[in-house]
């Protein structure tokens, strides 16, 4: 379903499902080297998530896949390494038009003329395991996998057995190599080497690897380095991380220098001066793909000028100056064997198609989401139908065609009662999702809410996973989040359970105790308030600092909204909407002020205000809230930022900026600890005005707000370092 056809509720539920699916597949791919889906299927999930987040930015979740890199390193026989410079991933493009838009986006951000040449590098994207090699004074001192981008596994002893990785870089002169330089690239296995390895593994009765990427990952991440030494691993560099200096002005020149130092780089690396050249190189590599000695899944483009890369910076998990142009995937036919219904945290009934196993891109697929009742009706799906699965990159893996819809067959009847608790299942007016009306009497919803509360993006309690939540719930030990913090009283009972020992119980209880002063934004997200997702939870806490302050603002704002209190279209508080002509004027002013305060936060609109109000007006939710806060004490929410003259202030940019784009200016402000707003109000501290500034400049003058020009803003940024 297109994003424009979705309601906010549908989008929120789909984002929740995507976050869980992608997290699962990240774990299988990065941590366990045992993926269940193809790269194209994974890309499709990520792509759909990005589309939904772009259409509904206020629904972005704290556990959003767009902010996650790889997967957190679990317990491992290999040591952990903290990356000095985060190992980022890349955003993806799937069409020529998206490549053109990427180039245009770079121009806009840098405020370049439309006809300005933007040189890019283009190289094949190897499907391997990301690795960072740290050289100090030219000698290899450490190697680490990417992990979650911040912490990876120490594989220094293992890479010593990879012939492509030199223990010492070749220097043309005494000062040719920086004192510190981290070379980053992919550890991979050539196709022929992979086939030979699997033949040896089969002959020895040992594990067969699914594909070269898994073979490379499984071979590198070995406790016994001699196992790695016996595997045919290779390495290709594609960039760098921490560096005491970068002895080049462009990406292309730096990659040539890395090659001169003795580290292999892609032989297909070229410079392109236009989007047309980039796409032409993509097609050329695509034609060579089958004949290349290693697996690739696309082409990577990077802005060539390093000073432009510095200006462009990063968003979430990816650089603005790079993108991966992925190759398309496949379609396949299979049979729909059954339709099962899953009940989610918010009561949504999601139909899941169980399929006759079908091979798509080398992976066997057995399940597919059918989204909702309307989607089943649109496709006329019935058990036994022959269907076409699409695994293209621009949508979620989905059923795109029913080949047998005209054949006589019993129709599928979507349930009108919850399969978990028997409560009536209905779709609210204007929504396509069918939801269980049982609320917290529905065990599926209660369990899902508890799972959500302890999930990685919420409280992230180690050892309290899905199976444990279900086990303790069925025993009656867990009914609400606060019960988690009372499990210490059941220590003796837990120890008596099968699979639990003194040490494992003590580890669990210690992990729970460690969360008694949780991050306030994570706690807010963990409560599962509808429409309060990732950035929204963090932005709410940035503004209100403490949870009680947020609760009071939400109660007042929702009262104002429910009573029809007027507000400006841009969400700014308008003093003219409050008149002191009654005894209740003060209270009304407070409610209006709270509403304006909430609406001034980027991404917070009436739907979020209503959701917060609904939550804090419902007696059961208040009881859960107060019970939880009797067990935990989240400290005031403070965001670490640079010490600057504008930290903590609200800034509005208006008019045309001549040396930077509006996005770049906003990114600078946020890095300095300021928050940006789209409109001027009494809460605005500073206005940065360029040529053509209009009504906002007049508003600032009327309110006595400081106004500076772009040069003064640049000086503030310079002084902050």
From Swiss-Prot:
GO cellular component: cytosol
EC number(s) recorded for this UniProt protein: 6.5.1.2
Active site location: 125 (n6-amp-lysine intermediate)
Chemical reaction(s) catalysed: NAD(+) + (deoxyribonucleotide)n-3'-hydroxyl + 5'-phospho-(deoxyribonucleotide)m = (deoxyribonucleotide)n+m + AMP + beta-nicotinamide D-nucleotide
Family matches, as PROSITE patterns: BRCT, DNA_LIGASE_N1, DNA_LIGASE_N2
UniProt binding sites for NAD(+): 39-43, 89-90, 123, 146, 186, 302, 326
Annotated binding of Zn(2+), by residue: 418, 421, 436, 442
GO molecular function, one term: DNA ligase (NAD+) activity
Domain called BRCT: residue spans: 641-721
Pfam families the UniProt entry points to: BRCT, DNA_ligase_aden, DNA_ligase_OB, DNA_ligase_ZBD, HHH_2
Disulfide bonds: none
Alphabetical keyword list: DNA damage, DNA repair, DNA replication, Ligase, Magnesium, Manganese, Metal-binding, NAD, Zinc
UniProt entry tagged with the keyword Amino-acid biosynthesis: no
Gene Ontology biological process terms from the UniProt entry: DNA repair; DNA replication
Region described as Disordered: spans on this chain: 556-588
CDD domains the UniProt entry points to: BRCT_DNA_ligase_like, LIGANc
Cofactor: Mg(2+); Mn(2+)
Family, per entry: Belongs to the NAD-dependent DNA ligase family. LigA subfamily.
Function as written in the Swiss-Prot or TrEMBL entry: DNA ligase that catalyzes the formation of phosphodiester linkages between 5'-phosphoryl and 3'-hydroxyl groups in double-stranded DNA using NAD as a coenzyme and as the energy source for the reaction. It is essential for DNA replication and repair of damaged DNA.
Protein name listed in UniProt: DNA ligase
Native organism: Novosphingobium aromaticivorans (strain ATCC 700278 / DSM 12444 / CCUG 56034 / CIP 105152 / NBRC 16084 / F199)
